[in-house]
UniProtKB/Swiss-Prot annotation:
The keyword Cell membrane does not apply. Pfam families: MFS_1. Belongs to the major facilitator superfamily. Allantoate permease family. This is Uncharacterized transporter C1039.04. GO terms for cellular component: endoplasmic reticulum; membrane; plasma membrane. GO terms for biological process: carboxylic acid transmembrane transport. GO terms for molecular function: carboxylic acid transmembrane transporter activity; transmembrane transporter activity. The chain crosses the membrane at residues 57-74, 100-120, 126-146, 157-177, 189-209, 221-241, 283-303, 326-346, 353-373, 379-399, 416-436, 445-465. Residues 1-20 are annotated as: Disordered. It is found in: Endoplasmic reticulum; Membrane. CDD domains: MFS_FEN2_like.
Length: 507
């Protein structure tokens, strides 16, 4: 059997769609059906065809995932908006019970992420993700019905379970459609939804909290509206999100073949490889994997501090309950814009480490500035510091997730590593939930200092990983007598990872 692709040419490459010429000029085995191993001469693919394919993915997949993550972030953090409307007082919270309520979410969030991640490989991310969305939408609705601290604790526990594997699932799902060099900006668009959710949540809360005279409190209406819309969107996503490139009804047969070849060439040797639990755990043997996990934890503190406490940080400047939510909109939107900027720069430079350091430094400076000035006498500077805080917090999370996915081409290992790394970042919400103590309100100076310190630790870890990768790549070049980059590594060598002497790190 011989399979040809009409969209093959020797067109010139641009910076967005550079293909690995040395890889595409080789004899590439492609599995076009059961029992049929075909070897075909594949040259540089038509870059216009690839751009059209990516554009289809961008318009048919990314908006759905962004919508999913928007409500994922919204339903997780809407309690911070509800608190500004007196939720904690209405439910009879005393002492540090609000902090405990924030903390309880992260325990099942971390415990369930790893086992739940296997559902994606077993049943497909396109089916499991909407199920989780239905679940956390239902929990958001339940928050409107709780009457006391115990009830809210129970709901937040199940909300943590429902949201635990959403982010790893989305990252894994995107790696089955996009090349490594295309991933950061797409993940950035997806992650930007979390920033947009903060802005959207602030605007919605601003409007809802103006409702007077109803049978429910404003914060209860907020939970009902957000939970109800989440539930409806989950049904739409289940019906529309493609299971894989092979089943995407918006692709032609030629585009499906092209899409499969792209990922086979850029990722592990087979897209549909079976999940091996024992093999997947070998990803943690390399010291770099441990450093990445520590990096995720360090950078998780600034990210969760922003997600959980931005309304309270803004409220410290003296704004009213209603206006506080409105004033969180601009920093959140700015964070989404900077997230895209950092991601596009990273993809353009083909470098994660340098851009990561720039993003983390920006956020760290924001926390330091806010904590070191008299905020009531310098409202403008304090508010500007909020923009700095949000500028790099989400970007650092995006680039870190992309970084280790870029360097973990084996599909099973990638799924497992993501399901561990992302929850570790989120479990640091336990830290952010407990360093913002009631006795330190309204400015929370100790919490701001601790958050900045974790940012500094993150910078040290990123720098250490980058330096190791640079010199390890040089060592491999010297041993083989040839200079290579990650783009020069053939497909068959990618799955083995660093154990293969031909492997090169994506810096």
């Amino acid at each position: 059997m011989e399979k040809s692709i009409s969209s093959i040419s020797k067109a010139s490459m641009n910076s967005d769609e550079k293909l690995d010429k040395k890889e595409w000029d080789q004899q590439l085995p492609i599995d076009f059906g059961e029992g049929e191993d075909v070897t075909t001469e594949v040259y540089i693919l038509d870059h216009k065809a690839e751009r059209r394919l990516c554009r289809k993915f961008d318009f048919r997949i990314l908006p759905l995932l962004a919508l999913l993550y928007l409500f994922n972030a919204l339903d997780k953090s809407n309690v911070s908006n509800a608190k500004t409307n007196g939720m904690d007082k209405d439910l009879g919270f005393v002492g540090d019970q609000y902090n405990i309520m924030i903390s309880i979410f992260y325990i099942p969030f971390v415990l369930c992420a790893f086992p739940f991640s296997y559902l994606y490989k077993r049943f497909g991310a396109a089916r499991i993700l909407p199920f989780f969305m239905l679940s956390f939408g239902a929990m958001s609705l339940c928050q409107a019905a709780v009457k006391n601290f115990g009830g809210m604790m129970a709901v937040r526990w199940f909300l943590g379970m429902a949201e635990s594997a959403v982010l790893p699932g989305v990252v894994y799902y995107l790696t089955t459609f996009y090349r490594r060099t295309e991933l950061a900006r797409r993940l950035a668009i997806f992650y930007a939804a979390a920033n947009v959710s903060s802005a959207f949540g602030g605007l919605l809360a601003y409007g809802v909290f103006h409702i007077k005279g109803g049978k429910l409190q404003g914060w209860q209406y907020l939970f009902l509206i957000e939970g109800g819309v989440t539930f409806l969107c989950a049904i739409v996503i289940f019906l529309v999100l493609p299971v894989s490139v092979e089943t995407a009804n918006f692709l032609t047969d030629e585009e499906k073949t092209l899409a499969k070849m792209r990922i086979e060439n850029d990722s592990s040797s087979a897209i549909s490889e079976k999940l091996s639990f024992k093999q997947s755990l070998t990803v943690f043997k390399h010291p770099i994997a441990i450093l990445w996990l520590l990096e995720e934890m360090a950078l998780g503190v600034p990210l969760n501090s922003i997600n959980n406490w931005l309304p309270q940080i803004v409220a410290a400047m003296g704004f009213s309950s209603v206006n506080t939510n409105l004033m969180t909109v601009a920093p959140a939107i700015s964070g989404a814009i900077w997230l895209l900027v950092f991601a596009f720069i990273s993809d353009f430079l083909k470098n994660r480490g340098i851009v990561l350091i720039a993003a983390i430094s920006t956020t760290m400076i924001g926390f330091i500035v806010y904590g070191s000035i008299d905020i009531m006498n310098h409202i403008g500077v304090s508010y500007f510091a909020c923009f700095l805080m949000t500028a790099g917090a989400a970007a650092s999370s995006v680039l870190t997730s992309t970084w280790y996915n870029n360097n973990t081409p084996n599909e099973s290992r990638r799924a497992v590593f993501t399901s561990v790394g992302v929850p570790l970042a989120n479990v640091m919400g336990l830290v952010s939930a407990n360093i913002f103590r009631p006795q330190d309100a309204p400015k929370y100076v100790p919490a701001l200092g601790i958050t900045a310190g974790f940012g500094g630790l993150g910078i040290l870890l990123v720098a250490s990983i980058s330096v190791y990768m640079f010199f390890d790549n040089r060592r491999r070049d010297n041993a083989q007598g040839v200079k290579k980059t990650f783009a020069d590594v053939s497909t068959k060598d990618l799955g083995e990872g660093p154990a293969n002497p031909n492997f090169r790190w994506f810096l």
